[in-house]
Amino acid sequence: IDYACKRQAFGKPLIDHEGVGFMLAQNQIDLKQAELMIDWCASVLDTGALGTTESSMAKVAVSEALFRIADNCVQVMGGTGLSRDTVVEQVFREVRAFRVYDGPTEVHKWSLAKKIKKSHKIANEG
């Protein structure tokens, strides 16, 4: 945010360019959604429930959101965002792995799809 507010391009701060402002707005939205998903999943687990569906949903949503956020930060900073002189490059590298830890995103989505199909079958048997 500091970079986007201070860096000038075409006579105005980067953040005042619609494309950059929209990316930063999306980052804020993604962060809040990730926070809410984590809180929701934790509340389910706090009841003593297994929370397998909820944790899969949260894992996918949060890891995908973090990757989008990091990618947007690199994009806003341009070549500077890929420099090892900034924390953005390190965060980008590290959050990419979140989409693989504890099962890749696709495995969690596949598991959720199987549960959706099973629920549909049960609902339509009666």
Where are these regions (language model features)?
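Alpha-helical interface subdomain recognition
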Residues: I1-G126
